[in-house]
């Protein structure tokens, strides 16, 4: 049995083209952030050229050390901050399933039993299917925003892995340098103590002065202070390494006797280098996600169309109520927000401003990236020149 007049609903659907034309006037034009980002990147100056550059695929290829690779592996598995980033990525993936589910029909079933004093027990069963038509692409925009959230979080996770690898590498190299400095200072102290002993023997024999003895003892004491400072600095770096690898107890490691070879990665053009950085790509994905949510907020001002089909049956027994003689109905509902105190319009404006904030956050990330690269290249260039001057001085 049918409860609807199809012709009446077809006539009402004729108004949909008019509603779609009105949607074009409600949704505003957003700034072309792609063009703005391209302009920002083109303003970056060329990088300094460094000699002896090497193409590497991974950060741990910069340092040839099995012990460092083992520590880095532990850090990737145990660092709590990195694990939080991974869990957040899994949350974004589940949220994407939620957003995708809004585009699909909702199906529900129910059963009931009714008993009264003046009638027999009646049993009922119903099956309903509801679906919201995506007239304006609002649900598609919401799903696209969820996809971009996954892209952003995945890139942030990659950036966090790169940052963690760089921090572990820096602490590892610092520990090697401090251990070498501590060994040198201990050897120097042994030499100073030997000198102090000779001066003391000469002083006892009346061949030296008290000033020479005081100077020797001061040098030994100063060296002892330097050893304490180096030892504490080494201990602090060990604690920092323990935090990075995500362990409460001190990690077991063996420092190499010599400095490891550290290669200089190849530097490409600024635009190519910046476009490969995961933090910048994540910031760009955040702009796109915010822009998609702005579209969703403005489309909330438009009418929505939902359809619902219900199949129900009633019988004197549970078996008889299982759709032996069902009654079906179809409901089409077109709802338009007329007045909500300006909340929907304010929400759309907020989303638009959040997109502008995402763009400024991209600019901030870009500035930090350029600063990091330029400072690293400048420091490396200065170290190369210092090494050349030292080699010249030693050869003289």
Describe the role of every protein-language-model region:
Residues 68-70, 122-124, 170, 215, ...:
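Transmembrane beta-barrel architecture of outer-membrane proteins
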């Amino acid at each position: 049995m049918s409860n609807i007049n199809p012709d009446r609903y077809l006539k009402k659907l004729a108004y949909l083209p008019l509603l779609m034309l009105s949607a074009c006037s409600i949704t505003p034009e957003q700034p072309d952030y792609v063009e703005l980002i391209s302009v920002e990147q083109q303003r970056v100056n060329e990088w300094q050229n460094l000699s002896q550059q090497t193409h590497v695929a991974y950060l741990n290829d910069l340092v040839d050390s099995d012990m460092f690779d083992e520590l880095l592996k532990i850090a990737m598995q145990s660092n709590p901050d990195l694990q939080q980033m991974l869990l957040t990525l899994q949350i974004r993936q589940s949220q994407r399933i939620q957003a995708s589910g809004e585009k699909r029909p909702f199906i529900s079933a129910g059963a009931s039993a009714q008993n009264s004093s003046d009638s027999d027990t009646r049993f009922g069963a119903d099956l309903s299917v509801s679906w919201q038509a995506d007239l304006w692409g609002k649900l598609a925009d919401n799903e696209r925003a969820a996809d971009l959230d996954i892209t952003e979080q995945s890139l942030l996770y990659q950036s966090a892995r790169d940052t963690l690898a760089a921090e572990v590498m820096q602490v590892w190299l610092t520990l090697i340098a401090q251990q070498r400095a501590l060994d040198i200072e201990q050897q120097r102290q042994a030499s100073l103590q030997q000198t102090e002993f000779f001066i003391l023997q000469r002083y006892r024999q009346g061949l030296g002065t008290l000033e020479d003895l005081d100077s020797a003892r001061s040098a030994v004491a100063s060296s002892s202070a330097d050893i304490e400072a180096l030892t504490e600095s080494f201990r602090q770096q060990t604690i920092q390494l323990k935090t990075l690898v995500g362990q409460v107890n001190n990690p077991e490691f063996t420092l190499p006797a010599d400095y490891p070879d550290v290669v200089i990665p190849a530097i490409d053009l600024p635009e190519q280098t910046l476009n490969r950085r995961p933090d910048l790509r994540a910031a760009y994905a955040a702009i796109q996600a915010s822009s998609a949510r702005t579209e969703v907020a403005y489309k909330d001002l438009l009418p929505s169309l939902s359809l619902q089909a219900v199949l129900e049956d009633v019988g004197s027994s549970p078996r008889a109520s299982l759709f032996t003689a069902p009654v079906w109905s179809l409901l089409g509902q077109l709802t338009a927000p007329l007045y909500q105190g300006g909340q929907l319009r304010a929400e759309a404006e907020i989303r638009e401003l959040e997109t502008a904030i995402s763009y400024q956050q991209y600019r901030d990330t870009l500035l930090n990236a350029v600063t990091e690269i330029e400072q690293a290249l400048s420091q490396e260039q200065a170290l190369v020149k210092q090494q050349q001057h030292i080699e010249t001085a030693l050869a003289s």
